[in-house]
Amino acid sequence: MENIIEVRNLKYKYDSESENYTLNDVSFQVKKGEWLSIVGHNGSGKSTTVRLIDGLLEAESGDIIISGDKLTAENVWEKRRQIGMVFQNPDNQFVGATVEDDVAFGLENQGLDYDLMVERVQQALELVGMQDFKEREPARLSGGQKQRVAVAGVVALRPDIIILDEATSMLDPEGRLDLIQTVKKIKDSNQLTVISITHDLDEIALSDRVLVMKEGQVESTATPRELFSREDLEELGLDQPFVNQVKVALRQSGLSLPDSYLTEKELQDQLWALLSKM
């Protein structure tokens, strides 16, 4: 599968006088159509990385290649049309008086034909299940509903890449799971690429690959299963998955279990298999 993003030897620091780099020689690739989660402690460089990809920041050195083209000052606005970004706090993204006005805002800036714009807004709201709230004021929505509208605003623009910058971190567990399942459905049905900065284990479990960042560098890449089998998850700013906690407790009780489980269902199946042999 071809790469839609290539990051090569990226360096960046917020203070030009400082000797300390926020990002120091960061390189990785994102394949077209994949879901890449980026994890690491606060300050590891995750958000800085995606802001550089989106052209919100300019690297001191290194290259960012998007769909075969090097990101430059001359083409940054063109490349931004390929990328939609959803941030942590949806209130900071709302500009419209109603939900449908807000989703239409980016399309208006692109000078889209009115009838096509109405069609795109309706389709986007239907995809995130918010069509019945189109005339509602954004301020009157729940946190999860606000993030759904933020996703709709991105989807309406028809990007190739969606970046979630801790977009689920302010939601309750049910709202987080609901939102990431919505994004996955949209990704799969439209063959989109998703980059997700997250500490949420359910979100990580849905991804194809995980990029682990530490102190401004890429520490490793792994599948979710490989990541969850690590014993130093807390050092990466992640909780131990529930299935890992259960596995440790069962091993301490004398049960022999495989090293990794990605879901509770896998653990249940293994336990049933063990019980059937007793």
Curated annotation (Swiss-Prot):
Its main location: membrane. Disulfide bonds: none annotated. Residues 5-240 form the ABC transporter domain. Its EC number is 7.-.-.-. It comes from the Bacteria. ATP-binding (A) component of a common energy-coupling factor (ECF) ABC-transporter complex. Unlike classic ABC transporters this ECF transporter provides the energy necessary to transport a number of different substrates. This is Energy-coupling factor transporter ATP-binding protein EcfA1. It comes from Streptococcus sanguinis (strain SK36). The gene is ecfA1.
